[in-house]
Design a protein with these regions (language model features):
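Conserved MFS/SLC helix-loop-helix module at the cytosolic interface between two early adjacent transmembrane helices
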Residues: 57-93
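Residue-level signature of mid-helix packing/kink "hotspots" within the transmembrane helices
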Residues: 24, 52-60, 142-143, 251-259, ...
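A late C-terminal transmembrane helix in Major Facilitator Superfamily
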Residues: 321, 325-356
C-alpha cells in the first residue's frame, strides 16, 4: 500500500475499533443492569435489539450520503453524535432514559460502516487485505469492550465505561478534523474494479444470508459475557470482570479469522468460501451452549475465528457484485440487514434465557442459522 492508502486505512480502522467498543459495552454489563434496574434478561435483550435496529437503520441513508458529503463529514458526525448519545447514557437514572441513549448510540454508530467500507473499496488497491486489516481493528474493538466495561464497572461504575469511550471518540474526532482534510488533495483513480451492472440476485441472496448471520451473531455477542459469568461461578475473582476477560479472549481470536479471510479471499472463489464459513458456523455455535469449562471456551474461539473470516470475504464480495456508484448504498443495506434486522437475535435470545436458560441460546441460534446454508449454496451458483 502507498502512503495515501495507509492514511485512509488508519483513519477508518480507528473509527471501526471505537464503533464496536461502543456497541459491546451494554452486553458486557447485562447482569449489573439487571440488578440495578430490577428487570429480566428478556427486557434487556429487547433494549439491545432496539440499539441494534437503530445501528442497522441508519446505515442505509449513511450509504447514500457518503457519495454526497464524503467520508470526512460522516466520520465527524459519527464521532460527535456518539459523544452526545453517551452523555445521555451516563446521566440516565431510569431504564427508559438508558434505552433512549442506547438507541441514539446505535443510530450514530450506524453512520460509520458504509462510509468506511466504501472508502476502502474505492481507494485501496488490495481490497481483501484492506478489508482484513480494517476488520482486525473492529475485532480489537469487540475484544477490548468487555474488558473496558468490566474493569470500569468493577473499579468505578458502568457509567464510567461509557464516559471513557466518549473521551476516546473526542480525541479521535480531533485527529479526524485535522488529518482527514488531506484526503481532498488526493487524486482518486478510476475504480478499475468497477462492476458495470449490479448482480441483483446475488446481492439479494447475500443480504438474506446476512439476516441469519446477524441474528445468530447478535444473540451470541449479547449473551456471551453473561453465559461465561454464569458458567464459571466456581472460579475466583469478580464475576463481571471474569466474564469480561473470557469474552475478550474469545473475541480477540476474531483477528485470526480476519487474517484468514483476507488471505483466502484474495486467492479463492469468495462465494464458495462463504458457503464453507456458513456451514462451519452451525456446529461450533451450538457447542458453546452444550459444553462447559475449557471445551466451551475452545468452541467459542473456533466459532469466532470462522465467523469473522466472513467479514473481509463478504465485504469484498459486495464490491465484486455491485456497480461502483451503488456501492455505498449496497454496504448500507447490507449492514441494515446484518445489524438491524439481525439485531432481533438479542430479543430472541432474551426470551430464550428467561424461559430455558442462557446456555440454550447458543444451540437455538445454530438452528436458526441452518437456512443460510441453502442460501449460501444458491449464491455460489449465481456469482
Amino acid at each position: 500500500m502507498n502512503r495515501d492508502e495507509k492514511f485512509i486505512l488508519t483513519i477508518t480502522a480507528g473509527s471501526h475499533l471505537s464503533v464496536h467498543c461502543f456497541m459491546l459495552v451494554f452486553p458486557s454489563i447485562l447482569l449489573v443492569l439487571k440488578n440495578e434496574f430490577s428487570v429480566g434478561l428478556d427486557v434487556l435483550g429487547f433494549i439491545a435489539t432496539l440499539s441494534a435496529l437503530m445501528f442497522g437503520i441508519g446505515a442505509i441513508p449513511s450509504g447514500y450520503f457518503e457519495s454526497k458529503v464524503g467520508g470526512r463529514v460522516l466520520l465527524l458526525i459519527y464521532q460527535a453524535g456518539t459523544i452526545v448519545a453517551t452523555m445521555v447514557i451516563v446521566i440516565s437514572q431510569s431504564l427508559w432514559m438508558l434505552a433512549t441513549g442506547l438507541a441514539l448510540l446505535g443510530l450514530f454508530c450506524s453512520i460509520y460502516h458504509p462510509a468506511g467500507l466504501t472508502l476502502i473499496s474505492r481507494r485501496i488497491s488490495n481490497i481483501s487485505k484492506g478489508m482484513a486489516l480494517h476488520g482486525i481493528a473492529g475485532s480489537l474493538g469487540l475484544a477490548l469492550a468487555p474488558v473496558i466495561a468490566a474493569s470500569f464497572t468493577t473499579l468505578f461504575s458502568w457509567r464510567a465505561a461509557y464516559g471513557f469511550l466518549a473521551f476516546v471518540n473526542f480525541v479521535l474526532a480531533i485527529f479526524t478534523f485535522f488529518l482527514v482534510p488531506k484526503m481532498k488533495k488526493m487524486i482518486v483513480k478510476e475504480d478499475h474494479r468497477n462492476t458495470k451492472v449490479t448482480n441483483k440476485m446475488a446481492l439479494i441472496l447475500y443480504y438474506s444470508i446476512g439476516i441469519f448471520m446477524g441474528i445468530t451473531f447478535a444473540g451470541f455477542t449479547t449473551f456471551l459475557p453473561t453465559h461465561f459469568t454464569l458458567q464459571t461461578v466456581e472460579w475466583s475473582g469478580s464475576p463481571t470482570l471474569r466474564g469480561g476477560i473470557l469474552t475478550s479472549l474469545v473475541l480477540l481470536s476474531g483477528i485470526i479469522g480476519q487474517l484468514l479471510g483476507g488471505y483466502f479471499g484474495s486467492r479463492f472463489d469468495k462465494a464458495y468460501l462463504l458457503f464453507i464459513i456458513v456451514v462451519l458456523n452451525v456446529p461450533f455455535l451450538a457447542l458453546i451452549g452444550l459444553t462447559s469449562g475449557m471445551m466451551m471456551i475452545f468452541s467459542g474461539i473456533i466459532f469466532v475465528i470462522v465467523h469473522f473470516s466472513m467479514q473481509p470475504i463478504g465485504n469484498s464480495l459486495i464490491a465484486q457484485i455491485t456497480q461502483s456508484n451503488h456501492r455505498g448504498v449496497g454496504y448500507g443495506i447490507s449492514f441494515f440487514f446484518s445489524f438491524g434486522a439481525g439485531g432481533f437475535g438479542a430479543g430472541i435470545g432474551g426470551l430464550i434465557a428467561e424461559h430455558f436458560g442462557v446456555a440454550k441460546i447458543f444451540p437455538a441460534m445454530s438452528i436458526i442459522l441452518i437456512p443460510a446454508i441453502g442460501l449460501a449454496w444458491l449464491l455460489k451458483k449465481k456469482v
